[in-house]
Amino acid sequence: TLTYGFAKEAAVGTSAPGGHGYPESSSGPGALPPGLWARDVVCHPRGSSFRIEDACSERSESIDFELKLPGKHNVSNALAAAATCRLMSVPLGKVAEALRDFQGIRRRLDLIGETGGVQVVDDFAHNPQKIRSTLEAVKLGSTRVLAVFQPHGFAPTRLMKEELIEAFSQTLSPNDILYMLEIFYAGGTVKRDISSVDLVADLVKRGLRAVYVPKRELLLESLREGARPGDTILVMGARDDTLTDFCHEILASLQNTTLQTSQ
């Protein structure tokens, strides 16, 4: 096995987002334990840059990395890939070269398009940690986020309700707006005793601008009327392949609209 993570956290023996624990260093304060560690992390709207230090041997190696994917969670993913390659004796320089051209995968901060200064982004985020990471990444390049979330499944929504509320409460800014569609129902005899209305009600109590939207047609109208230059419309949800189609509908709708410059 090979330990990896962020140098700032490893040097003080703390944990990184996602729950990775790092051993205390035996070489004194600020020293790194054996592993791969990211330093000088800079996340920007179109990607990330950082340096990976290989502290697995006496002769440490340090390589600069650039990603075309924003967000600290993608830096963590790159570290995991580098650690895997390191175990297979692939040089870090080769890993950096490969990741520099990596465009990402479908429905992970997937930029559908931009019109009138408004971006439409599609993402698979569906649990609290992924929602938090995705929102943090999108906010790097946005003056405001218009987040659209479709919870997936009644049982998962029931189970994660409080954590979902916490994720949105801690990540959304006062000027951001959350539009919540009804829970995605894939059929079956599942107990349907919770609704997106319940989540929205609790979010509103916390002072968030959260809106329940029962139909996508109504949401298209709201986004047409409310979007302005500098906004990012972020559509999140899992298991429903039509969400990507809906992103394209949003983009087409905005292209036929004169966007407001203020609100």
What residues fall within each predicted segment?
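Active-site regions of enzymes building and remodeling cell-envelope glycoconjugates
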Residues: 1-3
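ATP-dependent carboxylate-amine ligase
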Residues: 10-13, 17-34, 46, 60, ...
